From Swiss-Prot:
Pfam families: EamA. It is a multi-pass membrane protein. Keywords: Membrane, Repeat, Transmembrane, Transmembrane helix. It is found in: Membrane. It comes from Arabidopsis thaliana (Mouse-ear cress). GO terms for cellular component: membrane. The chain crosses the membrane at residues 4-24, 33-53, 65-85, 94-114, 134-154, 175-195, 207-227, 244-264, 272-292, 297-317. It comes from the Eukaryota. Its main location: membrane. Belongs to the drug/metabolite transporter (DMT) superfamily. Plant drug/metabolite exporter (P-DME) (TC 2.A.7.4) family. This is WAT1-related protein At1g25270. Residues 12-142, 210-316 form the EamA domain. One of its GO terms (molecular function) is transmembrane transporter activity.
Length: 355
C-alpha cells in the first residue's frame, strides 16, 4: 500500500512540474539552459545527501560503473529532458501529460522482450494485465482524438499565461507532428530507463548515489549541448521569476526527491507498476489546465480519463495478485524444504537407533 500512496503523490508532484514548465515554455525561456540548470541543481542537492546518509553504500568507481551511469544519465535525464520541453512548446500541457500514458504499453512490450515482465495469458492475472495496459493506451487515444462537447466545470478562471510573451499563441495552436514525436521519444527513453533501473539499479549504489550519478551525467551532457548551441551568456542569468521557481522545483523536488522514490518503487514492484499511474497525472493536469491555462476541457477528455484510470486499477490489482501468489509459492516451497529436512533428520535418528 505504501508504494501505491507514493506513486499517487508522485503524480501530483509531476503535474505541478507540467504546469510550471508550460508557463515557462510560453514565457520564451531558453529550454536547453533550463534543462541544464534543472539537472545541475538536482545533482548539487542529491550528492551531499548521498555522502552523508549513504556513505557505506557508495559504489566502487570502475569503468563498468561509469558506463552504467552514463547510459542511465542519457536515458533517464538527458534525452527525456532535451526532447520533452521543446515537444511541450509545440503541443499543450494536457497533450504532453496524455502522451505519457503509452509508457505502460512501451514498458510492458520492452519488458516482455527482455524477459523482465511475465504475461501468462492462461491466467486471470495475465489477461487482466494485458487488458489494463491496452485500456490505458485506448483511453489516451480517446482523450487526444475525441473532443465532444466542451465542459465548463469552473465558475471562474485564473489565466497564468496572461503575462507571457507567447501565451495566447502557444495555447491555441495546433499540435505539431514534430512536437508529438519529440514528446513520444521522451517517453520511450523514460521507459528504457525504468527497465534499466530494474536490471542494474543496485549496481549504482544506494538510491541517493543512483540519482546523483544519473543527474550528474545528465547535467554534464545538457550543459555541453547548451553551451555549444547558444553563446549568449544572458540566457544563463536567473532572476526571481517563474523560471527560477520551475528550475528549482523540477531540479530539487522532481529530479532530486521524486526520482529516488520512483527507483524504490521499481525495486519493490517493478517498472510496469510505476508507469501505470501516469493516467492520474493526466487527470490532474487536465483539471488544472482548464482552470489556470485556458485549455478547454471536453467530454472526450473525461471519458478517456475514466478509461485510463480503469486500466490503472486493473494493472495494480494484477501486480498485487502476482506478488501475493509469489509470496505464497515461496512460503510453500520453504515449508516443503523444512519438512523434507525434518523427515531426513528423523530417518537418520531411526537408523542410529537400530542395532
Amino acid at each position: 500500500m505504501k508504494s501505491v500512496v507514493a506513486m499517487v503523490a508522485v503524480q501530483f508532484i509531476f503535474a505541478g512540474m507540467f504546469i510550471l514548465f508550460k508557463i515557462t515554455v510560453d514565457d520564451g525561456t531558453n529550454l536547453k539552459v533550463l534543462v541544464a540548470y534543472r539537472l545541475s541543481f538536482a545533482t548539487i542537492f542529491m550528492l551531499p545527501l548521498a555522502l552523508i546518509f549513504q556513505r557505506k553504500k557508495r559504489p566502487e568507481f570502475t569503468w563498468r560503473l561509469l558506463l552504467l551511469a552514463f547510459v542511465s544519465g542519457l536515458l533517464g535525464a538527458a534525452i527525456p529532458n532535451i526532447l520533452y520541453l521543446p515537444g511541450m512548446a509545440r503541443t499543450s500541457a494536457t497533450f504532453s501529460a496524455a502522451s505519457s500514458i503509452i509508457s505502460p504499453l512501451i514498458t510492458l512490450v520492452l519488458g516482455l522482450v527482455f524477459r523482465m515482465e511475465t504475461l501468462r495469458l492462461g491466467s486471470n492475472e495475465g489477461r487482466a494485465k494485458l487488458v489494463g495496459t491496452l485500456l490505458g493506451a485506448c483511453g489516451a487515444l480517446v482523450f487526444v482524438f475525441y473532443k465532444g462537447i466542451e465542459i465548463h466545470i469552473w465558475s471562474t478562471h485564473v489565466d497564468l499565461l496572461k503575462g507571457s510573451h507567447t501565451g495566447r499563441a502557444t495555447t491555441n495552436h495546433h499540435v505539431s507532428i514534430l512536437g508529438v514525436l519529440m514528446v513520444l521519444g521522451s517517453n520511450v527513453s523514460t521507459s528504457l530507463w525504468l527497465l534499466l533501473q530494474a536490471k542494474i539499479g543496485k549496481e549504482l549504489g544506494g538510491l541517493y548515489w543512483n540519482t546523483s550519478l544519473m543527474n550528474g551525467v545528465g547535467s554534464l551532457v545538457c550543459v555541453i549541448i547548451a553551451l555549444c548551441s547558444d553563446h549568449d551568456w544572458e540566457q544563463w542569468q536567473l532572476g526571481w521569476d517563474i523560471n527560477l521557481l520551475a528550475t528549482l522545483y523540477s531540479g530539487i523536488v522532481v529530479s532530486g526527491m521524486v526520482v529516488p522514490l520512483v527507483a524504490w518503487c521499481i525495486a519493490t514492484k517493478g517498472p510496469l507498476f510505476v508507469t501505470v499511474f501516469s493516467p492520474i497525472r493526466l487527470v490532474i493536469v487536465a483539471l488544472i489546465g482548464s482552470f489556470a491555462l485556458e485549455e478547454p476541457l471536453h467530454l472526450g477528455s473525461i471519458i478517456g480519463a475514466m478509461i485510463m484510470v480503469g486500466g490503472v486499477y486493473l494493472v495494480v490489482w494484477c501486480k498485487m495478485k502476482e506478488k501475493k501468489s509469489a509470496s505464497t509459492t515461496s512460503d510453500h516451497i520453504e515449508t516443503n524444504k523444512n519438512n523434507k529436512e525434518l523427515d531426513l533428520g528423523n530417518l537418520s535418528s531411526v537408523n542410529r537407533d537400530v542395532p
